[in-house]
Amino acid sequence: MIETAAADILAGGMVPLEMTQTQIFEAVQSDTLLASSLWINIALAGLSILLFVYMGRNVEDPRAQLIFVATLMVPLVSISSYTGLVSGLTVSFLEMPAGHALAGQEVLTPWGRYLTWALSTPMILIAVGLLAGSNTTKLFTAVVADIGMCVTGLAAALTTSSYLLRWVWYAISCAFFVVVLYILLAEWAEDAEIAGTADIFNTLKVLTVVLWLGYPIFWALGAEGLAVLDVAITSWAYSGMDIVAKYLFAFLLLRWVVNNERTVADVASGLGSGSRGGAAPADD
């Protein structure tokens, strides 16, 4: 039976060098804990898409609409990416390099998560930056640093030639993350005060920073790093953070935008813009 063979593969930690997509799919599905961490996100992403479309049906202000579009892209990207993961399309078994706790073993690597993050987290930052009344330069810097963080994180996960190089890529990714944190905690926090959106911004800022800090921590503890946690546990940690950092975050943001559309419009017209030094609002 393929299911039994897949279960033996995961249990033993050793797999053939060339697994077909069907074999990877069976391996993922045979691990109930791992598979459930993916299916739950597909279900919640689908429900979130329907809910957010309904919430935004009467929004008329262009800036508020742009926030809605950026936020709606988050579950749209997630449902696509998690479908890729659950199908085995964006999952590989990679042999860990010498020095790794699982050196020589083929470890399931759901690298498709990095595609999710590279496409969805910039949308989160765009939505938050627009809410804060940020200018184009800060938005661009945050988004580029965020994409750099995700791409170098992917490089860390896929590097099999050297265990040290995996951690070098990890350190570079964390450096990009520091740039994102600085903009969120310093630049945009001040902009939001000027824009009159500080209350909701501070809530979203804390939610984002606390949860996003969890990703590099679980990477380091998971099979890709120190291998203290197995693949299924790490997958649930990522999925749990995704649920709160994406869907709950998006709901809180969009609910506030719907109830405070006039405030958002004032930011767009420059009445509360946090763009200091005469810089234009991000959507001008």
Swiss-Prot record:
SMART domains (UniProt xref): Bac_rhodopsin
Sequence ranges on the Extracellular membrane side: 1-30, 87-110, 160-162, 222-230
Ranges that cross the membrane: 31-56, 63-86, 111-132, 136-159, 163-185, 198-221, 231-259
Cytoplasmic side: 57-62, 133-135, 186-197, 260-284
Keyword terms of this UniProt record: Cell membrane, Chloride, Chromophore, Ion transport, Membrane, Photoreceptor protein, Receptor, Retinal protein, Sensory transduction, Transmembrane, Transmembrane helix, Transport
Membrane topology reported for the UniProt record: Multi-pass membrane protein
Annotated compartments: Cell membrane
GO cellular component, one term: plasma membrane
Keyword tRNA-binding tagged: no
MF (Gene Ontology): monoatomic ion channel activity; photoreceptor activity
Gene Ontology BP term (one): phototransduction
Residues with PTM N6-(retinylidene)lysine: 246
Function summary: Light-driven chloride pump.
Name of the protein this chain belongs to: Halorhodopsin
Natural source organism: Halobacterium sp. (strain SG1)
Name of the encoding gene: hop
